[in-house]
Amino acid sequence: MLLHIGIDDTDSPNGMCTTYLGALLYREISRLAEPTDLPRLIRLNPNIPYKTRGNGAVAMTFEVDEEAVPEVKDLVLFYVNQLADFTHENTNPGVVFFEGEIPEELQEFSLKALREHVTIEEAERVAREVGAEFFKFKLGRGIIGALASIGYPLERFTYELLAYREPENWGTPRKVDAESVFLADRWSYPFTYDNVDPYKRTILIAPHGKDPVLVGLRGIDRGRVLQTFEMVRFGEPVAFYQLYKTNQNTDDHLTPKKIGELKLYDSAVVRGRVSKPYWERGRHVFFELEDETGKIRVAAFEPTKKFRNYVRKLLPGDEIIAAGGVKEHEGVLTLNLEKFYPVKLVPKIEYRKPKCPRCGGTMKSKGDYLKCKRCGYRMPKKLIPVEVPRELERKIYEVPPDARKHLSRPLVLPGGEERVLEALGNSG
């Protein structure tokens, strides 16, 4: 029979990683049953505040002989009991088992958990309705992600190869040869991506926490991902690695909405007009976007670096499509900008001094009159309006790789502009 297994919320900022636990289990269970595919790393709503780190759950599906099912389930629960970081207050693991074909109701729940806010009670209700078996540890919030990862319709996917460290190295600086990463990236880009930040000359594949992950390599071609990994040199042993199928970098979290429909923790694409000039606070750039249903504050936060320069070029009246997640900032609902597309830009007018009507020379301001620097001709001070080029193009602007959310699709990948342009088609 088909047995689906979902696990979530076993990690904490202090260590552990649900993918590590998942990779160990996948290897162990494969001795007892036949995997139908790679294990799946499913990222859920990135805006939820009580996520442990990247809000990623792990699912896997096996063809299991009926008499082996209890042994497989016991193995999963044993591993979670042994390896989850129960000491952290935000770590509330959940495990879900489901037998047979995935019903539509479970798929719908998965997409809701990706795009909106879902409660533990909702997850329990759906699990009971579809006949899934669930186990809660502590508060058991992890059953939301565990159930959602099982039901997730992975129509668009990428790959991530995760290499893990030997336990004695956990919590120490990772030893990854940066030059080898740049060389590997040059060979494999864009089939693998977000390996490096070419502007800062930094590598992005190695996390910085105390967790077991040594590196994570992302790509759209599994062969290239594996070959790229072989090209990277390490100054410490690799314990083992696991290739995951994942919804990372798919933009599947984004759904078109009107501004008035936006709720806290939504991920959405909206179309609207910039209603007033941008302002800055603490290196963050803000502006207001409105449509016929309402207004929302939009933010390009400091970590987005140069992306903020493009946001600063927006003017009141500009019509744009904006994509991002809704959070609360300073008590105000705020769209955390991931991408934007200028649909219609208003003319930019600057007022300039005219040329000297007598000799064509440059006029200089002298109180309430203008005086020609060349011939001395004087005239009343009157500036003339001149339309100047806008410094924004009709293209999608995105945050840099090190500020990109796990789910956000880079423009370098096929379909990187799809969600934004769908909004253009829907409302244009």
Swiss-Prot record:
Q: Which GO terms describe its molecular function?
A: ATP binding; ligase activity, forming carbon-nitrogen bonds; nucleic acid binding
Question: What's in the keyword line of the UniProt record?
Answer: ATP-binding, Cytoplasm, Ligase, Nucleotide-binding, tRNA processing
Q: Which family does it belong to?
A: Belongs to the TiaS family.
Q: Domain of life of the organism in this record? A: Archaea
What Pfam families does this protein's entry cite?
TiaS_FLD, TiaS_TCKD, tRNA_anti-codon, Zn_ribbon_TiaS
One GO biological process this protein is involved in is:
tRNA wobble cytosine modification
Catalysed reactions listed for this entry:
cytidine(34) in tRNA(Ile2) + agmatine + ATP + H2O = 2-agmatinylcytidine(34) in tRNA(Ile2) + AMP + 2 phosphate + 2 H(+)
Q: What is its EC number?
A: 6.3.4.22
Q: Which CDD domains match?
A: RPA2_OBF_like
Give the protein name, as stated in the record: tRNA(Ile2) 2-agmatinylcytidine synthetase TiaS
Keyword flag Phosphoprotein = no
Tagged with keyword Ribonucleoprotein: no
Q: Which residues form the signal peptide?
A: none
InterPro entries registered for this protein in UniProt: NA-bd_OB_tRNA, TiaS, TiaS-like_TCKD, TiaS_FLD, tRNA_Ile2__agm2C_synt, Zn_ribbon_TiaS
Localization annotation: Cytoplasm
- Organism, per UniProt? Thermococcus gammatolerans (strain DSM 15229 / JCM 11827 / EJ3)
**Job of this protein:** ATP-dependent agmatine transferase that catalyzes the formation of 2-agmatinylcytidine (agm2C) at the wobble position (C34) of tRNA(Ile2), converting the codon specificity from AUG to AUA.
